[in-house]
Amino acid sequence: MRFSDSVVLIFGGTTGIGLMTTIDFIIHNTSHIILASRSKWKWKRAIEKIQNIFGDLVNLSNEFNISVLNSTVEYIPCDIRIENDVKQTIQKTIDKYHYINVYFNNAGIQPTTGHTDGDITEIEIPSEKLFDGTIVYKISQNNSNNDNLNNDNSNNDNSSVCSTPASSYCENPIATFIMGMTFCLKHEVKFALEQKSNIPVSIINMSSRNGVNIPSSDRPIYSACKAFIHSMTQTIATQSAKLGIEKNRSIRVNCIAPGPILTPLEIPIFLPDKKNVFEPLSNLELQQFQEIGSHGVPMKRTGTTNEISPTVLFLADYNQSSYITGSTITIDGGYTASPLIG
C-alpha cells in the first residue's frame, strides 16, 4: 500500500486544500496523519467532513484523534507564527511515532481587511526600538464587530482588524508566510537530520500563482511573502540535499503554486459579500466565483481542491518523485503560462 508506513504532518490541514489532502492520504492507507492548526472548531468541522465521506468507517477515539480505514488522524493545536509551537508539534509527533517522513506546510491566510496588505501607503506594522536596541514589531489584536469575521462561534479566537472572513485570528502575511514558514523549515530539516529512522523525507510547501511570476498588485505583501516561499523552497532544497549527503539522509523540498481554487480562503477574494465562507455556495454564488475567479485563466474556470491534492501526494511519494527537489509546480489552469489572456 502506497503510504502504509508513512507519518504525515500537515500544518493547516483542517480546511480547503489541506483537508482534501488529508482525505487523499486516508484513501491511500497512510498510517498516521497529524493535522496542526490554530482552530479546534475547524478540526471538529473536519471530522464532520471526513464522516460525510467515510461514514461508519470513522471511529472517534477521543476529541483529538480519529481512525479511518487503515489510518489514524490526530489534531495538535499549533500556531506556526510561534516557533516553540512548531518545534513542540514536531517533537510530540516523533516522540509518539518515532519519525516523520512527509511534511506539508499548508498553513495559509488571505488578508482582506484591516491594514496588513493592499495600498502600500496604508499598511500598518507597528514597531518600536527598545532601550537595549531591540526592535519590536507588533501584530495588533484590536476587536472588530464585523459579522463576516465571526464565523467560528468560538470564544477562543479573538477577532481583530487584520482578521479575515475565514479566520478571526490576526492575519498578517509576514507573520504566517515568512516567520511561520521559516520556523517550519528550520525544525523540519533539523528533525529530519536527527531522527533515528533513515527513511526519505519529503517537505512540500504551499505558495501561490502570485508568488511565482505574476504578483497581485492589490496584495503586494501577500504576493511578496508567497515569492519568499518559492525562493526558500529552492535554497532549503539545496541545503538539505548537501546536509543529507553528509548524514546519509534523503531530504527533498518542493513547492506547489495553485491558481484560483474554491476554498474558504479564496471565497472572500471573489465573493466579498459572502458572510459565512464555510457554508456551501448557492448556484448563483458558484457561478459568480467561477466568472470572477477564472479571469485570466486560459482554461476559463477555477480549480477544485481534488485537483491539487494528487500533486501533494506525488511529491510525498519517494517512489514516484525521488529525483525532484527544489521545484515549484504551478497548478493554475495555465494562468502563469499565459498572463495576457483575459
Swiss-Prot record:
Protein name: Uncharacterized short-chain type dehydrogenase/reductase R419
Protein family per UniProt: Belongs to the short-chain dehydrogenases/reductases (SDR) family.
Keywords for this protein: Oxidoreductase
Residue positions binding NADP(+): 9-31
Record: residues binding substrate: 208
Active site: 222
Pfam families: adh_short (PF00106), adh_short_C2 (PF13561)
EC nos: 1.-.-.-
Molecular function terms, GO-annotated: oxidoreductase activity, acting on the CH-OH group of donors, NAD or NADP as acceptor
Record's keyword annotation contains Oxidoreductase: yes
